[in-house]
Regions:
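Glycan-recognition patch characteristic of GH18 chitinases/ENGases
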Residues: 98-183, 375-376, 380
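Substrate-binding surface in catalytic domains of secreted glycosidases
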Residues: 140-147, 203-303
């Protein structure tokens, strides 16, 4: 038995204190796991309760660092679970509480867009294998940096996270024949990246031309210790064979049944072990999309009562100004992550700034994050064993 994961639905009259006492946890842990800043909770809101249930009695030579390494814990998790530990030295006869990961190892690919907050970046690094900076573009005049990432690259490397550069294509003629492969590789190496991410759809190019381009690009990258991540779009799945990894994009607004069916269908016809499944970051506000965190926080501030649609996996409420707002529930994300595990995907991909901390905490309670540029395929294939 590992961590007890409970998804609690808030009832009328419940407060953080009441809920914390009910599950034998603290208000501080509830706030941290659910990104709660004020006192307001929405009736019908789902809260994540994580309670470590295993203990380990340290040996004489054990330190906090060695125990963290042994059980795959980050500092925040270790010290949060064990308030009696103040530094690297472990008190005598203290039982260390830890969290096993029932789904085993997986990789994560977090996207860093312009405007991502430093605090959010620092918090998310604990859970990342790769960080993809959406920071460069192919233009008619060459490669252009959209924003500076030099400091963030250093921070990522210190945390053992591989930095990757996402290169947009903003040329007037998007044929792959006119791409200078050496310039792409030189740009990645000069800036300190460990890999390159490209959209696999190139307007005006035949699939055979794109495949030939990817073969030549990958050959140049391997000689420079770089990896290639392909971002799929319509009709480009077969091109993933030419990449080290690829991203199966989210269809924002799809219900849980549609998500599960799409992921299963992909796994049955493609190589899931080298594929990241993108996680949702948007809900719906009327006919428009709205970030899930904003949808949830609006409900808290306005003290709206949330309705749960178990068939779709969405929570919803009627906002006074914008009408119906709906967004994926914690149950949706838990089930989506179970699907990722069941069909043997490499891991998940998500927008660092937009992916709710609640969702990330569910992921981290289920998977151990790989921290290496060289994927440990044996660890992935034996996931959960």
């Amino acid at each position: 038995m590992g961590t007890k994961m409970i998804i609690h639905t808030v009832s009328d009259g419940e407060t953080l204190k009441i809920i914390a006492e009910k599950y034998g946890t603290s208000e501080e842990r509830l706030r941290e796991h659910n990104e709660i800043e004020g006192e307001s909770l929405s009736v019908g809101e789902q809260l994540l309760i994580l309670i470590p249930t295993r203990t380990y009695y340290p040996k004489p030579r054990d330190s906090a660092e060695s125990v963290m390494a042994r059980f795959g814990m980050c500092e925040r998790e270790f010290y949060g679970n064990n308030p009696g530990v103040r530094d690297s030295r472990l008190p005598k006869d203290l039982a260390i509480r830890y969290t096993p990961h029932p789904y085993g190892a997986a990789a994560t690919n977090g996207y860093f867009y312009k405007g991502t907050s430093p605090e959010r970046f620092a918090d998310t690094l604990l859970h990342l294998t790769y960080v993809t900076f959406a920071s460069s573009a192919l233009c008619d005049s060459g490669i252009k940096e959209l924003f500076d990432t030099s400091e963030e690259i250093k921070i990522a490397k210190r945390a053992g996270v591989v930095p990757i550069v996402k290169i947009f294509d903003k040329r007037s003629d998007r044929s792959v024949k006119k791409i200078n492969i050496d310039s792409i590789v030189d740009h990645a190496k000069k800036c300190g990246y460990g890999g390159i991410s490209l959209d696999l759809a190139y307007t005006g190019s035949e699939p055979s031309e794109i495949a030939e381009f990817l073969v030549e690009l990958r050959r140049a990258m391997i000689g420079n210790d770089l990896i290639l991540i392909g971002e799929m779009s319509g009709g480009s799945e077969e091109l993933c064979d030419y990449c080290d990894g690829c991203v199966l994009p989210i269809c924002e607004g799809e219900n849980l049944g549609e998500f599960t069916s799409r992921v299963k269908d992909y796994a049955e016809r493609s190589e899931s072990i080298k594929t990241f499944v993108e996680m949702p970051v948007f809900g719906k506000a009327g006919e428009a999309f709205i970030p899930i965190k904003e949808a949830r926080d609006r409900a808290r501030r306005g003290k709206y009562r949330l309705d749960s649609d178990k068939s779709s996996g969405f929570l919803s409420y009627d906002h006074k100004r914008v009408g119906k707002i709906s967004f994926p529930s914690l149950e949706y994300i838990k089930a989506a992550l179970a699907t990722v595990n069941e069909y043997g995907f490499m891991g998940i991909s998500f927008d660092i700034n937009g992916f709710p901390g609640q969702f990330l905490n569910i992921y981290y309670s289920l998977f151990k994050t790989l921290k290496s540029i060289t994927r440990t395929y044996s660890e992935l294939y034996n996931r959960g064993s």
